[in-house]
Amino acid sequence: MDRRIGAQFYTLREHTRTIEDFEVTCRKIHEIGYQIVQISGTPLAAEDMKPILDRYGLKVVTTHRNFEFFQDNLDEIISYNRTLGCELCGLGGMSDCFRASDEMTGEFIRQANPIAAELRKAGLYFGYHNHAFEFLKFGGRYVMDRLINETDPENFKFIVDTYWLQIGGQNPAAFIRKMGDRAMAVHFKDLRILNAKSVPTMAEVGEGNLDWDDIIRACEEAGVRWALVEQDICYRDPFESMKMSYDFLTAKGFE
């Protein structure tokens, strides 16, 4: 596994709306110490971002788009990722219309498989990012089991999210081990209990309740290529949150 910890820019989405803000964000992330990133949540063109990323020594390892964009603009996704020098084309999540039934899960798989195959022909990979709904059961089987078993392991990879695995009732480390190298990237996202009503929420890595020693070991054993810090909801300045997570993980042996 790449020991350089990554920054998921979705955490910083409010700070990547303009090219000027994007440059400031890249500078701050570089100053924290991050060397790899995921591009997500920004409307900016790859051609405009790439020189800035290069200036601050930031390597893009994955991106995120919604499924409708994959369906309608696959050539653009291929061009976008190639411009950024990034081989993993991430899907942010299954569209709502596919989440309602076993039949619709099958329809998503039927539509996603040829997209993943086309990306592989272009030298890229399709990466499915999980939430918790994939652990709904239809007909006695998880949606996730169908995503694993009815897709091509050579084409259809996963961007595993530790927080959403825990919310879905899964052990993140055990799930990563089960996935092996199909888990091409992992979002390191912690979970803490917000209040006495037992409301779960996201936290800086190391500030919550997940077992990070076991998760990190699982990533190493499974052959995960990249680990990226993500925190959709921050309760302080998001750059401070990103630094806290970075400091925790560098103490665990990341760079």
Predicted features and spans:
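Conserved, mostly hydrophobic/aromatic
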Residues: A7, I29, V37, L53, ...
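Charged helix-capping and loop-helix junction motifs
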Residues: E20-V24, L74-D75, M104-A112, G140-D145, ...
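H/E-rich (His + Asp/Glu) clusters that bind or coordinate divalent metals
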Residues: G208-I216, A222-E230
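Active-site beta-loop-alpha junctions enriched in small/polar residues
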Residues: Q8-L12, S40-T42, H64-E68, M94-D96, ...
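Active-site acidic/histidine proton-transfer and metal-coordination neighborhood
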Residues: E47, R55-K59, F67-F158, I167, ...
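N-terminal pre-domain/capping segments
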Residues: M1-E87, D181, F254-E255
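C-terminal helical cap(s) of enzyme catalytic domains, especially alpha/beta-barrels
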Residues: D237-E255
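Acidic/histidine-rich catalytic cores of soluble enzymes
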Residues: K121-N209, I216-A218
